[in-house]
Structure formats: C-alpha cells, structure tokens
C-alpha cells in the first residue's frame, strides 16, 4: 500500500511525508470531468417541470474529478475520490457545500449526470462550490465501503475538504468561510456524521455554518434496526452493513458464515463483483433476518453483549449535541428510511442542549425517491438564509416556499 502511494506521490509531486502523517491531507490529482452551461441546466429543469423561479441559474459550472489521500478505519492512508462543482466566472469568495450521496454498491462513476448530480448543480449554478465525496471504497478509491459508519464517512469528507483547499489555490477559487453539509439517504446520515467528526476532531480546521440531513438512518440501534424483522424493499442494506461492521468490530471470524444457504455464497459473490443494488435485492429474502442463521438472530435478540449492539450504538447519530444549526428533513411515507429517525434524533439532540436543531417535513405522502426532490429544495432555502445573513437559519424565501407548496399539491406520491 505505502509503496503504491509512494510511486503515486513520486509521479505527481505529492509530499511523501503527508502519506504517513495523519495530519497531512493532500490532493493527488484533478482533471476537468464535465462542463454544464446555464442553458443546458435550464432546459433540464423545464423538461422535469421544475419551476425556474425556485433556483437561480446564474453560472455555468465546471465539474472536476479529484483524487486525494484519505484514511482507512485504522488510520492508514488510502486513495479516495470525489467530484468538485465550481461555478465559472466568479472572483468573489464563495460559500462551500459538501453534498453526500445516497447508497451505492458499485465502484467507479457513471459517465452521465444523474439525479444527485443535479442537486449539486442546483447549488453550484447559484454561486456555491460543491464537493461530492465518493466515500472510502467507492468511486476510484481503495478498499471497500464501510456502510453507515460515521467515522469513515466523516473522514472521507474532511480529507476532501483539506484537498479542496489545495485545489482552490490551483484554480484561483476563494472560500468565504461558510461551510454547509447536506446529503440524502445514506448521504443524510453522512452529512450529520461529517458534522460530528468535524466537531469532535477538526474544530480548529473547519467551522460548520449549518447542516441539513435528509432522510438519514440516524437511529441505527433503534428505529432503523426494526426493518430487519419485517418485509423491506431494500434487504441488501443488511449484508452491506454487516460487511463493514465486521471489518471494524470483528463480530464473527467469517461474516459469510452467519448466512443461511444459498445466501452464504450469493452475498459475497454479488458484493465482490460490485453488483447493482437492485440486482442484489432480487436474490435476497423480503424479510432481511431470513438470510441470517437463527443462532445469530437469537444472539442479537437475546444477548445485549453481542458485538453488533456496540457497532450500532457507536454509529447512531442521535446522542450528541451539535454546536451549529441543523435541519432534519423527512417524509412520512418513506419506505426505506423510517421517518422516525429524524424525530428521535431531533428529540435527543434537544434534550442534550442543542438549541438550533429543527425538523422539516418534506411531504406526508411521499416515499423515499420523491422525498429527495423536496428535501433538496428545502435544504437550498435553508442554506440560502445563512448566505443572506441569518445566524441560525430560516425557512427561506416566502414566495419560493409557496411555489414548493403548490408543487407538493401537484406531484403525486
């Protein structure tokens, strides 16, 4: 590993000291990936019936593919990657957003712009720079993804922020000091994870202006764990979670030994070749626990010292006191992430003394996918209020909120 990093460092001029020093966070390389014009984005918005009055399309955007050094869970350096969205033609300092994407099981990157890319563009065309980390083990990075583990997710984002400082110098970009964190689904969880990691370990390096977690599974050991015992639309979440948890917490010597046949061979094959989430779901039982041997299910149910409980508790994000404002958005009919995750997180953060944590209902009738549209819009309004001078955040422009309300009436579940 270190030999390969050394060769990369030699080839790219990266300071070799940074690879062995946990405090050294360095960009390895970047290249222009795509450019998007105002006209292209406006056309896309109109084709999807998004009111252009909701988003100011003011700038063309360059998107850079960035490779940088991050860290594995044991602190050793690993390669990581991400995309950096930069508005063109701005010389004034700009606010910065870290957008955390939802669950992915495949490495690499689609060559076309997908749904979450347009959420990033929604910020960038209005004058925000946007980082979208691939997370450890995804994109073009090394190792495998430690799904729903807050320290790994947060570390990938923090290291990307350090790398972006260097890239800003190369591109002549200035930051205005405002840092916003957001994301959806696993990304909603990851945005709050990054907030926690910065507050715990990097408060001298970064100051979070505000975070907006959208449809995140924050209550890992509580509300979200209940899906294991009932019919669930995305059963692949369980083996994905167990794969990463076993790497860090050593729950069992061989994680594949806990599965009933034929899942004991199908699961490592599907995850090993980076199958699409839908393909994995099709070979798994509707009730997630049915893929696991009953002896392990009973250990989980009856033994509070079973290591899985510690793994879930360590990675629940409901029991800490954020120092900066946070908005938690949810939708009542979300079939993948129980909306009560946001309720529980909000209640416990307030109990611990957090003063500026708010709830936002993205829609009582929407499921997981349509909730992403409205939670993204509410996040933009929330972040804009800080850019416009609010200290603790507001709901946003009244006219735009009215347009959103009309859209919610028009768009079916």
Where are these regions (language model features)?
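Accessory cap/linker subdomain of secreted extracellular hydrolases
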Residues: 214-319
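Short alpha-helix in the alpha/beta-hydrolase fold that links the catalytic acid
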Residues: 194, 324-326, 338-349
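Alpha/beta-hydrolase active-site loop
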Residues: 147-169
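Short, surface-exposed "cap/lid" segments of acyl-processing enzymes
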Residues: 72-81, 85-125, 140
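C-terminal catalytic histidine-bearing segment of alpha/beta-hydrolase fold enzymes
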Residues: 304, 308-310, 336, 343-344, ...
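Catalytic-loop region of hydrolases
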Residues: 19-91
